[in-house]
């Protein structure tokens, strides 16, 4: 695989030189030396527990689908850039992917020996039903020496395979891409086969649905000789693992030839496509669909390498628009490969993992920029319509400009930059619907393609809207019956169907509740035996609206819950007394003349559970200036503002730089557990811990 010009710089920036055992802001990092893999030193690092993925793989089956698949290999500036900050960072312009419905497997790649995916990618990919692999790579002379040591004996090969399997299992990702890009002594090839075979065996035992994929590089003769197709020189490795990632300099006939050699396993052949276009069929970049179309015709799988090209080369007009445009090429060639959600509860606030503000139930908690891909919720399957201002534009917004500004200058900027700055209902995103709509017309657009098999238990649909009085927004649900008959139901605050001659469907009127400036709609229904197959937005005007006018509405969230499942859910919120919370590594260091800096690691757990069912926690801090310092007691009248510090996805959070003024006697930390359906308890009933500063000595390092 190619090494970009930015790799050396990126690697030096990615993992700072620090003592990985000493407490510090949690980071993700690779393992660079074989000895470190052997010694298991990763598990001794302060950062280990923060790097665990906690979101389970949310699909009905652990197996890959029996069809041509899409693998996406990350490769972005050498890896470990903004995504290395496990608790997030302040660069809202960091690289992100949100087109998960167009892929089956995501590989995190760098040129370090053992590339461990940052948990943000695994959390988000699993939420969308996508498997995540790390990368084991050896290259050049150093790689040859590494292989010589690793493959010295059969037992050594097995031991290193077990180390890799242990890492994947402990950290919650789904396997490895094995890339040996150097020569190997031919007499060690049997041990290389044992390494691959044993890795697959151990991984499959510990992680159902795990994958080991071989990269087309070294051959069974020990030569580094890229084949670009499945041949007798690389097939022996293919036979031992779950798939092969073919090098990307293949010719037009190679996909079909590879499919013939693979036989029944042709879907396990992933033909590489370099998005930068370095020797790839069709040239990659904006003509990537040429290669994708050919692979689809030949009924083999695709491996898209380095989609970060859009970001790294600053494709115009801006990253968000260019990213949507580029991935629309993939969709046109390959179609939608992921249908989600497949399990309940279903919830999305359209958060893309970055933004300019954070809101909670309509109330803005922060107006600071942020980046944390773990926070990405289920992404809508919006269709990309370039330069078409004659219809309502539908965009996911993370920026928050005033979308209700109808001045000509603002409208031009809105369409050019695809950004509206309105606070969100939850998180940092929403969907903006904006354009011209006649009074007697309606507009629909796809949001999600679920595959939810429903029972006799009622389901509740809720969604939040912010709009002016002339713009209405409903949710259109499409169902399939056991006999494959289709049925659609409109969930809306009123029944507009009688006004539209071309529509014949049932309307379910919602109950309405106002939360801040948002209107929350809710309705329940029973669709026993049916399958929910599509969720769409339905835009229309109130009755008696006749003229064409500007339509604008924000969709803040949408959720679908099962009544019975909700009552039996282990994530039913528990009182603070059901938890234990502790402070570790507490340290007070000098700040400026009138302040100090508090550093502390917070850890919590449910008393009766070994592993928490929660995958998200809001962490707050509150300065205490009173003399009431009784632990585990929330002040009825806080002496200062409660501040959101961040969001944790494991039951731990490291507070690295909390500035406390000289008159602050203690800091109360509060942790608010959040359910998968975004349910959460009251903050004043959350588990909490008081850290008394008066008994702490100031550490001057």
From Swiss-Prot:
By its UniProt entry, which Gene3D superfamilies does this protein fall under? Galactose-binding domain-like, Glycosidases
Q: Which GO terms describe its biological process?
A: N-glycan processing; protein deglycosylation
Keyword field contains Lyase: no
Swiss-Prot/TrEMBL catalytic activity = an N(4)-(oligosaccharide-(1->3)-[oligosaccharide-(1->6)]-beta-D-Man-(1->4)-beta-D-GlcNAc-(1->4)-alpha-D-GlcNAc)-L-asparaginyl-[protein] + H2O = an oligosaccharide-(1->3)-[oligosaccharide-(1->6)]-beta-D-Man-(1->4)-D-GlcNAc + N(4)-(N-acetyl-beta-D-glucosaminyl)-L-asparaginyl-[protein]
Enzyme class, top EC level, equals hydrolase
Phenotype reported upon loss of the gene: No visible phenotype under normal growth conditions, but the double mutants engase85A and engase85B accumulate very high level of free N-glycans carrying two GlcNAc at the reducing end, but their counterparts with a single GlcNAc are completely absent.
Subcellular location, in the record's words?
Cytoplasm, Cytosol
Q: Where mainly found?
A: cytoplasm
List keywords of the entry alphabetically: Cytoplasm, Glycosidase, Hydrolase
Identify the gene encoding this protein. Answer: ENGASE2
Spell out the CDD domains in the cross-references.
Answer: GH85_ENGase (cd06547)
Task: Look up keyword Disulfide bond and say if it applies.
Answer: no
Please name the PANTHER family in this protein's record: CYTOSOLIC ENDO-BETA-N-ACETYLGLUCOSAMINIDASE 2, ENDO BETA N-ACETYLGLUCOSAMINIDASE
Q: What is the protein's given name?
A: Cytosolic endo-beta-N-acetylglucosaminidase 2
GO MF, one annotated term? mannosyl-glycoprotein endo-beta-N-acetylglucosaminidase activity
């Amino acid at each position: 695989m190619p090494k970009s010009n930015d790799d050396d710089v990126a690697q030096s920036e990615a993992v700072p030189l620090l003592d990985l055992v000493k407490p510090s802001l949690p980071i993700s990092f690779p393992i660079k030396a074989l000895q470190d893999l052997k010694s298991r030193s990763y598990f001794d690092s302060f950062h280990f527990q923060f790097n665990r993925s906690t979101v389970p793989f949310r699909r009905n089956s652990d197996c890959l689908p029996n069809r041509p698949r899409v693998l996406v290999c990350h490769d972005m500036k050498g890896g470990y850039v903004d995504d290395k900050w496990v608790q997030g960072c302040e660069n809202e312009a960091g690289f992100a992917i949100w087109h998960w419905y167009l892929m089956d497997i995501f590989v995190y790649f760098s040129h370090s020996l053992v590339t461990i995916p940052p948990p943000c990618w695994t959390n988000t990919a699993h939420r969308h039903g996508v498997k995540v692999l790390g990368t084991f790579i050896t290259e050049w002379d150093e790689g040859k020496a590494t292989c010589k040591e690793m493959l010295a004996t059969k037992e050594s090969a097995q031991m290193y395979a077990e180390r890799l399997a242990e890492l994947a299992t402990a950290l919650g990702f789904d396997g490895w891409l094995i890339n040996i890009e150097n020569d190997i002594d031919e007499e060690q090839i049997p041990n290389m086969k044992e390494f691959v075979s044993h890795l697959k065996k151990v991984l499959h035992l510990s992680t159902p649905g795990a994958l080991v994929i071989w990269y087309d590089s070294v051959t069974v003769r020990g030569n580094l000789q890229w084949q670009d197709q499945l041949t007798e020189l690389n097939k022996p490795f293919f036979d031992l693992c779950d798939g092969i990632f073919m090098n990307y300099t293949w010719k037009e006939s190679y996909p079909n030839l590879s499919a013939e050699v693979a036989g029944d396993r042709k879907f396990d052949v992933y033909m590489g496509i370099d998005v930068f276009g370095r020797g790839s069929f069709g040239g990659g970049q904006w003509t990537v669909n040429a290669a994708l179309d050919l692979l689809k015709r030949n009924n083999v799988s695709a491996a898209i390498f380095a989609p970060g090209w859009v970001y790294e080369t600053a494709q115009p007009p801006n990253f968000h628009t260019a990213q949507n445009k580029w991935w629309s090429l993939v969709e046109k060639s390959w179609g939608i490969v992921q249908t989600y959600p497949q399990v309940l509860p279903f919830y999305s606030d359209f958060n893309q993992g970055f933004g300019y503000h954070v809101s909670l139930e309509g109330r803005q908690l922060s107006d600071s920029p942020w980046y944390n891909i773990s926070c990405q919720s289920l992404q809508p399957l919006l269709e990309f319509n370039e330069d078409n201002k004659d219809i309502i534009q539908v965009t996911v917004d993370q920026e928050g400009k005033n979308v209700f500004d109808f001045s000509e200058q603002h409208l031009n900027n809105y369409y050019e930059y695809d950004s509206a700055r309105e606070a969100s209902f939850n998180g940092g995103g929403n969907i903006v619907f904006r354009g011209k709509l006649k009074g007697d017309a309606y507009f629909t657009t796809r949001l999600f393609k679920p595959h939810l098999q429903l029972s006799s238990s009622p389901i509740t649909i809720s969604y939040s809207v912010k709009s002016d009085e002339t713009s209405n927004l409903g949710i259109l649900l499409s169902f399939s019956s056991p006999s494959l008959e289709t049925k659609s139901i409109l969930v809306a605050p009123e029944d507009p169907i009688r006004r539209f001659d071309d529509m014949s469907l049932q309307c379910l009127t919602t109950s309405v509740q106002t939360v801040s400036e948002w209107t929350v709609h809710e309705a329940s229904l029973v669709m026993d035996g049916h399958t929910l197959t599509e969720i769409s937005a339905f835009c229309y005007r109130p009755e008696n609206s006749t003229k064409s006018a500007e339509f604008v509405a924000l969709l803040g969230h949408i959720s679908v819950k099962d009544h019975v499942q909700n009552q039996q859910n282990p994530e039913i919120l528990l009182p603070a007394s059901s938890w234990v919370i502790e402070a570790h590594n507490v340290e007070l260091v000098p700040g400026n003349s009138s302040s100090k800096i508090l550093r502390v690691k917070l850890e919590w757990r449910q008393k009766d559970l070994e592993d928490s069912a929660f995958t998200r926690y809001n962490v707050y801090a509150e300065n205490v200036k009173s003399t009431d310092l009784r632990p585990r007691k929330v002040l009825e009248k806080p002496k200062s503002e409660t501040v959101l510090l961040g969001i944790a996805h494991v039951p731990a959070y490291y507070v690295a730089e909390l500035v406390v003024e000289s008159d602050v006697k203690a800091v109360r930390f509060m942790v608010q557990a959040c359910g998968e359906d975004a349910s959460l308890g009251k903050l004043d009933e959350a588990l909490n811990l008081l850290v008394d500063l008066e008994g702490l000595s100031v550490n001057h390092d």
